[in-house]
A protein has these predicted regions:
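Short hydrophobic beta-strand element within catalytic cores of glycosyltransferases
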Residues: 307-310, 320
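A conserved mid-protein helix/loop that constitutes part of the nucleotide-sugar donor-binding site
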Residues: 18-22, 212-235, 251
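Short, structured helix-loop element that forms part of the nucleotide-activated donor/catalytic region
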Residues: 48-51, 199, 226, 241-264
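Membrane-proximal helix-turn-helix segments that form the acceptor-binding/catalytic region
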Residues: 132-158
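Short glycine/serine-rich donor-binding loops of glycosyltransferases
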Residues: 295-298, 316
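Aromatic "clamp/platform" in nucleotide-sugar-dependent glycosyltransferases that forms part
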Residues: 271, 290
Length: 388
């Protein structure tokens, strides 16, 4: 099939971006003719030339007006529509809020729901500023059109919670939404030298073998709940250490850790390229996010054999089985609840968690994920042929 994939920034660095790159490479490997429409692209391999017949991927640069963020969003949506209409594709799948596509994958969630949830962590006046902020108004306008009948042939949600949000806010029929969970490369996190890697990382960071090591991975600390994680950790009875990985301004959180008297026990590492070894060094993954469509980091933690403690509002909570491989947080701002869930998760038998996660994640392979995507593609192409 000749397939167009739309992503404003295409790269194999970063969670959502790596996912799109993975889809493109997997589909190209199966012999499909893949065309990437992006405003910019950057990656670690030579295939990121404008056209690569060897990789089966062709890149098309979409003009984007730089400057104000709302202008960038709108110009990408308008220009990608213009360029896509100049070509004939069997399937057009967008990973962005755009104006011309057959399939939209709502990997970034529902913006209307995010604005609702962020009221929990924003000052009271921000709610009113959002109503006049042109960026939010543009995103909401595109999102509304995107979910209007006639502007899509199928929608893919990465969790059942995400599906319910779209139905609730926009009235999209349930039959028009397919839930396909994110994939994970289990082998990437299944190091046969697990204990050796664990000891190396702990020694480098000054973490004792007997310390309970908690890991937080995610960029955008405010939304993903780092403040709650730090405050909850300060209440733990066990001897613990917290590793924080991700891109954001850490100074606010460093000051809070100092205020609580726990600064020496919180390690801010920034973004890293070798995150696998930190999963292996940890005893538990903590992710008390305020809103998250589906956290790839939770899947990665499970693949590394960690119990996961995360918010129910995280789509990835649907793969957490309480009391077996982790626990869920009902209120991501309730640090007492988070502390209790962490202590409960640390009591789980680690070998049992490792074995359970390994078996549970078998259907989450890239091979199975792409098979599910292709089933949707075939359904959509069938509809297109029926409608002429």
């Amino acid at each position: 099939m000749k397939i167009a994939l739309i992503r404003q920034r295409y790269t194999d660095f970063g969670g959502a971006e790596r996912y799109v790159a993975g889809v493109a490479k997997q589909l190209a490997h199966l012999g499909h003719d893949i065309h990437i429409y992006a405003g910019s692209w950057r990656a670690s391999s030579k295939e990121e030339s404008r056209s690569s017949s060897r990789s089966g991927i062709t890149f098309h640069r979409v003009p984007v007006a730089r400057g104000l963020s709302f202008i960038e969003v709108l110009s990408f949506a308008l220009n990608s529509r213009r360029l896509l209409k100049e070509e004939n594709f069997d399937v057009i799948q967008s990973f962005e809020r755009t104006l011309y596509q057959d399939i939209y994958r709502a990997g970034d969630g529902c913006h209307r729901e995010w604005l609702k949830q962020r009221e929990k962590i924003d000052p009271w006046y921000k709610k009113y500023l959002h109503t006049i902020n042109p960026l939010h108004q543009i995103i909401l306008a595109i999102e509304k059109q995107l979910f209007t009948e006639g502007h899509y042939r199928m929608i893919i949600a990465n969790s059942f919670r995400g599906k319910d949000e779209i139905i609730h806010h926009y009235g999209v029929p349930s039959t028009s939404i397919r839930v396909i969970y994110n994939p994970v490369d289990v082998d990437r996190f299944n190091d046969p030298d697990r204990m050796e890697r664990r000891d190396e990382v702990r020694k480098t960071l000054g973490i004792a073998a007997s310390d309970r090591c908690i890991l937080f991975v995610g960029s955008g600390f405010k939304r993903k709940g780092l403040l709650s994680a730090i405050m909850a950790a300060s209440k733990l009875r066990q001897t613990w250490q917290l590793i924080v990985i991700g891109r954001d301004h850490a100074s606010v959180y460093e000051k809070e850790a100092s205020r609580l008297g726990i600064r020496p026990f919180v390690h801010f590492l920034g973004p890293v390229t070798d995150v696998e070894k930190y999963y292996l060094a940890a005893d538990l993954f903590l992710f008390p996010t305020v809103y998250e469509p589906f956290s790839n980091a939770c899947l990665e933690a499970m693949a590394a054999g960690l119990p996961v403690v995360t918010s129910r509002i995280n789509g990835a909570s649907e793969v957490v089985v309480e009391g077996t491989n982790g626990y869920m947080i009902e209120d991501p701002l309730n640090t007492d609840e988070i502390k209790d869930r962490v202590e409960m998760a640390l009591q789980l038998n680690r070998n049992s968690v490792i074995h359970y996660n390994r078996e549970y994640l078998k259907p989450f392979s890239w091979q199975n994920h792409v098979r599910q995507l292709l089933e949707v593609y075939l359904e959509v192409t069938g509809k297109k042929h029926q409608n002429g």
